[in-house]
Protein backbone atom coordinates (compact mmCIF):
# COMPACT_ATOMS: atom_id res chain seq x y z
CA UNK A 1 0.00 0.00 0.00
CA UNK A 2 1.67 3.18 -1.19
CA UNK A 3 0.88 6.85 -0.72
CA UNK A 4 -1.00 8.16 -3.74
CA UNK A 5 0.30 11.02 -5.86
CA UNK A 6 -1.97 13.64 -4.32
CA UNK A 7 -1.02 12.74 -0.75
CA UNK A 8 2.66 12.57 -1.70
CA UNK A 9 2.49 16.11 -3.07
CA UNK A 10 0.95 17.31 0.21
CA UNK A 11 3.63 15.58 2.24
CA UNK A 12 6.33 17.23 0.15
CA UNK A 13 4.81 20.64 0.92
CA UNK A 14 4.65 19.82 4.62
CA UNK A 15 8.23 18.53 4.81
CA UNK A 16 10.30 20.61 7.17
CA UNK A 17 7.34 22.02 9.10
CA UNK A 18 7.94 22.35 12.86
CA UNK A 19 7.01 19.26 14.86
CA UNK A 20 3.67 19.87 16.53
CA UNK A 21 4.69 18.08 19.71
CA UNK A 22 7.51 20.59 20.14
CA UNK A 23 5.16 23.55 19.77
CA UNK A 24 3.36 25.52 22.41
CA UNK A 25 -0.42 25.31 22.40
CA UNK A 26 -0.57 28.84 21.00
CA UNK A 27 1.84 27.93 18.18
CA UNK A 28 -0.13 24.79 17.36
CA UNK A 29 -3.38 26.75 17.18
CA UNK A 30 -1.82 29.33 14.89
CA UNK A 31 -0.37 26.61 12.64
CA UNK A 32 -3.78 25.04 12.06
CA UNK A 33 -4.80 28.00 9.89
CA UNK A 34 -2.42 26.53 7.34
CA UNK A 35 -5.14 24.01 6.43
CA UNK A 36 -6.93 26.78 4.54
CA UNK A 37 -4.26 26.67 1.84
CA UNK A 38 -5.27 23.09 1.00
CA UNK A 39 -9.02 23.71 0.74
CA UNK A 40 -11.27 24.38 -2.20
CA UNK A 41 -13.70 27.26 -2.56
CA UNK A 42 -16.61 27.34 -0.10
CA UNK A 43 -19.87 26.15 -1.63
CA UNK A 44 -23.01 28.22 -1.24
CA UNK A 45 -25.63 26.65 1.00
CA UNK A 46 -29.27 27.61 1.48
CA UNK A 47 -28.49 29.40 4.72
CA UNK A 48 -26.34 29.32 7.83
CA UNK A 49 -27.72 29.98 11.31
CA UNK A 50 -25.21 31.29 13.84
CA UNK A 51 -26.15 30.69 17.47
CA UNK A 52 -24.94 29.91 20.95
CA UNK A 53 -26.10 26.82 22.80
CA UNK A 54 -25.78 26.33 26.56
CA UNK A 55 -23.08 23.97 27.73
CA UNK A 56 -22.50 22.80 31.30
CA UNK A 57 -19.93 25.55 31.97
CA UNK A 58 -20.16 27.99 29.05
CA UNK A 59 -22.26 29.00 26.09
CA UNK A 60 -20.94 27.27 22.97
CA UNK A 61 -20.71 28.88 19.51
CA UNK A 62 -22.54 26.78 16.96
CA UNK A 63 -23.73 26.90 13.37
CA UNK A 64 -26.41 25.12 11.41
CA UNK A 65 -25.69 24.69 7.71
CA UNK A 66 -28.90 24.10 5.78
CA UNK A 67 -29.06 22.47 2.34
CA UNK A 68 -31.60 23.44 -0.28
CA UNK A 69 -35.07 21.98 0.16
CA UNK A 70 -37.91 21.94 2.60
CA UNK A 71 -37.65 20.87 6.21
CA UNK A 72 -37.83 19.43 8.67
CA UNK A 73 -34.36 18.20 7.75
CA UNK A 74 -32.47 15.16 8.95
CA UNK A 75 -29.46 16.44 10.85
CA UNK A 76 -25.82 15.68 11.55
CA UNK A 77 -24.26 16.88 14.80
CA UNK A 78 -20.68 17.54 13.65
CA UNK A 79 -17.77 17.57 16.10
CA UNK A 80 -14.57 18.82 14.54
CA UNK A 81 -11.11 17.35 14.90
CA UNK A 82 -7.56 18.50 15.61
CA UNK A 83 -6.63 16.79 18.81
CA UNK A 84 -9.18 18.33 21.21
CA UNK A 85 -6.76 21.29 21.31
CA UNK A 86 -6.87 23.22 18.04
CA UNK A 87 -9.13 24.21 15.12
CA UNK A 88 -12.55 25.81 15.06
CA UNK A 89 -15.64 26.18 12.89
CA UNK A 90 -13.99 28.71 10.58
CA UNK A 91 -11.31 26.21 9.59
CA UNK A 92 -14.02 23.59 8.98
CA UNK A 93 -16.39 25.89 7.09
CA UNK A 94 -15.58 24.50 3.62
CA UNK A 95 -15.99 20.91 4.83
CA UNK A 96 -19.27 21.65 6.60
CA UNK A 97 -20.84 23.40 3.63
CA UNK A 98 -19.94 20.48 1.39
CA UNK A 99 -21.32 18.00 3.93
CA UNK A 100 -24.71 19.72 4.06
CA UNK A 101 -25.01 19.95 0.29
CA UNK A 102 -23.85 16.41 -0.42
CA UNK A 103 -26.00 14.66 2.17
CA UNK A 104 -29.09 16.87 2.20
CA UNK A 105 -28.78 17.03 5.99
CA UNK A 106 -28.72 20.10 8.18
CA UNK A 107 -25.26 20.16 9.75
CA UNK A 108 -25.18 21.33 13.37
CA UNK A 109 -21.54 22.12 14.14
CA UNK A 110 -20.43 22.93 17.67
CA UNK A 111 -17.28 24.67 18.86
CA UNK A 112 -16.68 22.75 22.09
CA UNK A 113 -14.18 24.06 24.64
CA UNK A 114 -10.60 22.94 24.08
CA UNK A 115 -7.89 21.25 26.08
CA UNK A 116 -5.56 21.86 27.84
CA UNK A 117 -7.55 24.72 29.37
CA UNK A 118 -10.60 22.46 29.40
CA UNK A 119 -9.45 18.82 29.51
CA UNK A 120 -11.58 15.67 29.60
CA UNK A 121 -14.46 15.47 30.24
CA UNK A 122 -15.26 19.08 29.27
CA UNK A 123 -15.12 18.67 25.44
CA UNK A 124 -17.30 15.56 25.71
CA UNK A 125 -19.72 17.18 28.15
CA UNK A 126 -20.05 20.15 25.77
CA UNK A 127 -20.68 17.80 22.85
CA UNK A 128 -23.34 15.86 24.75
CA UNK A 129 -25.04 19.06 25.90
CA UNK A 130 -25.13 20.43 22.36
CA UNK A 131 -26.56 17.17 21.04
CA UNK A 132 -29.25 17.19 23.72
CA UNK A 133 -30.04 20.82 22.86
CA UNK A 134 -30.66 19.90 19.23
CA UNK A 135 -33.09 17.15 20.20
CA UNK A 136 -34.93 19.49 22.54
CA UNK A 137 -35.11 22.38 20.07
CA UNK A 138 -35.42 20.42 16.83
CA UNK A 139 -38.76 21.90 15.84
CA UNK A 140 -37.56 25.48 16.26
CA UNK A 141 -34.56 24.92 13.96
CA UNK A 142 -36.45 22.90 11.31
CA UNK A 143 -34.87 19.54 12.17
CA UNK A 144 -36.53 16.12 12.38
CA UNK A 145 -35.62 14.71 15.83
CA UNK A 146 -36.13 11.15 14.61
CA UNK A 147 -33.31 11.55 12.08
CA UNK A 148 -30.44 13.08 14.06
CA UNK A 149 -27.03 11.44 13.97
CA UNK A 150 -23.52 12.36 15.05
CA UNK A 151 -20.31 12.72 13.04
CA UNK A 152 -16.74 13.75 13.72
CA UNK A 153 -13.24 13.45 12.36
CA UNK A 154 -10.05 12.62 14.26
CA UNK A 155 -10.54 13.85 17.84
CA UNK A 156 -14.06 14.78 16.77
CA UNK A 157 -14.53 11.14 15.78
CA UNK A 158 -13.57 10.22 19.33
CA UNK A 159 -16.15 12.66 20.68
CA UNK A 160 -18.79 11.44 18.24
CA UNK A 161 -18.21 7.84 19.31
CA UNK A 162 -18.47 8.83 22.97
CA UNK A 163 -21.64 10.85 22.36
CA UNK A 164 -23.10 7.77 20.66
CA UNK A 165 -22.22 5.69 23.72
CA UNK A 166 -24.09 8.12 25.98
CA UNK A 167 -27.05 8.77 23.66
CA UNK A 168 -27.28 5.40 21.93
CA UNK A 169 -31.06 5.19 22.23
CA UNK A 170 -31.69 8.56 20.57
CA UNK A 171 -29.24 8.79 17.67
CA UNK A 172 -30.12 7.49 14.22
CA UNK A 173 -26.51 6.95 13.09
CA UNK A 174 -22.85 7.69 13.76
CA UNK A 175 -20.13 8.60 11.27
CA UNK A 176 -16.55 8.32 12.50
CA UNK A 177 -13.86 9.64 10.17
CA UNK A 178 -10.21 8.81 10.98
CA UNK A 179 -11.20 8.54 14.67
CA UNK A 180 -8.69 8.42 17.53
CA UNK A 181 -10.28 5.93 19.90
CA UNK A 182 -7.66 4.58 22.30
CA UNK A 183 -4.44 5.49 24.07
CA UNK A 184 -2.46 2.61 22.60
CA UNK A 185 0.63 3.67 20.69
CA UNK A 186 1.82 0.11 20.06
CA UNK A 187 -0.56 -0.71 17.20
CA UNK A 188 0.88 -1.42 13.79
CA UNK A 189 -0.44 1.84 12.34
CA UNK A 190 1.18 3.89 15.10
CA UNK A 191 4.47 2.08 14.60
CA UNK A 192 4.46 2.07 10.79
CA UNK A 193 3.35 5.71 10.47
CA UNK A 194 5.21 7.22 13.39
CA UNK A 195 6.68 9.99 11.25
CA UNK A 196 6.36 11.51 7.81
CA UNK A 197 2.60 11.22 7.23
CA UNK A 198 1.25 14.66 8.30
CA UNK A 199 0.29 13.37 11.76
CA UNK A 200 2.96 11.73 13.89
CA UNK A 201 2.75 9.31 16.78
CA UNK A 202 4.47 11.83 19.04
CA UNK A 203 1.91 14.46 18.05
CA UNK A 204 -0.84 12.06 19.10
CA UNK A 205 0.88 11.52 22.44
CA UNK A 206 0.92 15.33 22.83
CA UNK A 207 -2.76 15.61 21.98
CA UNK A 208 -3.80 12.81 24.31
CA UNK A 209 -1.74 14.25 27.18
CA UNK A 210 -3.49 17.59 26.82
CA UNK A 211 -6.94 16.00 26.49
CA UNK A 212 -6.67 13.66 29.45
CA UNK A 213 -4.87 16.05 31.79
CA UNK A 214 -4.94 14.39 35.19
CA UNK A 215 -7.88 12.10 34.34
CA UNK A 216 -7.32 8.34 34.09
CA UNK A 217 -8.18 6.67 30.81
CA UNK A 218 -11.86 5.75 30.81
CA UNK A 219 -14.24 4.15 28.34
CA UNK A 220 -15.68 7.54 27.40
CA UNK A 221 -12.23 9.01 26.82
CA UNK A 222 -11.16 5.94 24.84
CA UNK A 223 -14.35 4.48 23.30
CA UNK A 224 -12.52 1.45 21.90
CA UNK A 225 -12.56 0.15 25.48
CA UNK A 226 -16.34 0.51 25.89
CA UNK A 227 -19.20 -1.94 25.50
CA UNK A 228 -20.83 -1.17 22.16
CA UNK A 229 -24.01 -3.26 22.22
CA UNK A 230 -27.07 -1.43 20.96
CA UNK A 231 -25.25 1.45 19.30
CA UNK A 232 -26.72 3.10 16.19
CA UNK A 233 -25.53 2.11 12.69
CA UNK A 234 -22.01 3.30 11.98
CA UNK A 235 -19.94 4.41 9.02
CA UNK A 236 -16.24 4.33 9.87
CA UNK A 237 -13.77 5.88 7.43
CA UNK A 238 -10.03 5.40 7.84
CA UNK A 239 -6.93 6.51 5.97
CA UNK A 240 -4.29 3.98 4.97
CA UNK A 241 -1.30 6.10 6.00
CA UNK A 242 -2.43 7.31 9.39
CA UNK A 243 -1.20 6.54 12.91
CA UNK A 244 -4.80 6.14 14.13
CA UNK A 245 -5.89 3.87 11.26
CA UNK A 246 -6.03 0.77 13.44
CA UNK A 247 -8.26 2.52 16.00
CA UNK A 248 -11.02 2.87 13.42
CA UNK A 249 -10.47 -0.59 12.00
CA UNK A 250 -10.61 -2.22 15.43
CA UNK A 251 -13.70 -0.25 16.45
CA UNK A 252 -15.54 -1.25 13.29
CA UNK A 253 -14.70 -4.89 14.01
CA UNK A 254 -15.92 -4.50 17.59
CA UNK A 255 -19.19 -2.95 16.42
CA UNK A 256 -19.73 -5.75 13.92
CA UNK A 257 -19.05 -8.40 16.56
CA UNK A 258 -21.70 -6.78 18.77
CA UNK A 259 -24.27 -6.89 15.97
CA UNK A 260 -24.17 -3.17 15.20
CA UNK A 261 -24.63 -2.45 11.47
CA UNK A 262 -21.32 -0.96 10.34
CA UNK A 263 -19.57 -0.03 7.14
CA UNK A 264 -15.78 0.28 7.19
CA UNK A 265 -14.29 2.31 4.35
CA UNK A 266 -10.52 2.55 3.98
CA UNK A 267 -9.01 5.23 1.77
CA UNK A 268 -5.81 3.31 1.47
CA UNK A 269 -3.60 5.78 -0.39
CA UNK A 270 -4.13 8.88 1.69
CA UNK A 271 -3.24 10.57 4.97
CA UNK A 272 -5.02 11.58 8.16
CA UNK A 273 -6.24 15.17 7.57
CA UNK A 274 -8.05 14.64 4.24
CA UNK A 275 -11.29 16.22 5.52
CA UNK A 276 -9.50 19.58 5.66
CA UNK A 277 -7.70 19.19 2.34
CA UNK A 278 -10.47 18.84 -0.23
CA UNK A 279 -8.74 21.26 -2.59
CA UNK A 280 -5.80 18.91 -3.11
CA UNK A 281 -7.04 15.48 -1.98
CA UNK A 282 -10.06 13.77 -3.56
CA UNK A 283 -10.99 11.51 -0.67
CA UNK A 284 -13.31 13.85 1.23
CA UNK A 285 -15.51 14.43 -1.81
CA UNK A 286 -15.58 10.69 -2.49
CA UNK A 287 -16.54 10.09 1.14
CA UNK A 288 -19.39 12.58 0.89
CA UNK A 289 -20.87 10.78 -2.09
CA UNK A 290 -20.70 7.47 -0.27
CA UNK A 291 -22.22 8.99 2.86
CA UNK A 292 -25.13 10.33 0.85
CA UNK A 293 -25.86 6.82 -0.42
CA UNK A 294 -25.39 5.19 2.98
CA UNK A 295 -27.59 7.69 4.79
CA UNK A 296 -30.28 7.22 2.16
CA UNK A 297 -30.32 3.50 2.86
CA UNK A 298 -30.83 3.78 6.63
Residue ranges and their predicted role:
Residues 1-64, 296:
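A glycine/proline-hinged amphipathic helix-loop "lid/cap" segment
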Residues 152, 156, 160:
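Gly/Ala-rich beta-loop-alpha elbow adjacent to hydrolase catalytic centers
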Amino acid sequence: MTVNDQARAVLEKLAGAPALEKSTVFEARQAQWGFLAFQGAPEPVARIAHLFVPGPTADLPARIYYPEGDGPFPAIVFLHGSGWVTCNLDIYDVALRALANATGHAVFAVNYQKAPEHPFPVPLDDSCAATAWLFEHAASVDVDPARIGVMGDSAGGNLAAAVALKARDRLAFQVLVVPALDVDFTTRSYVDHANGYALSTEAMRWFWAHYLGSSPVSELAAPLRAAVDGLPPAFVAIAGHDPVRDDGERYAAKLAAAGVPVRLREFDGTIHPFVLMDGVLDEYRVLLGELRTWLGEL
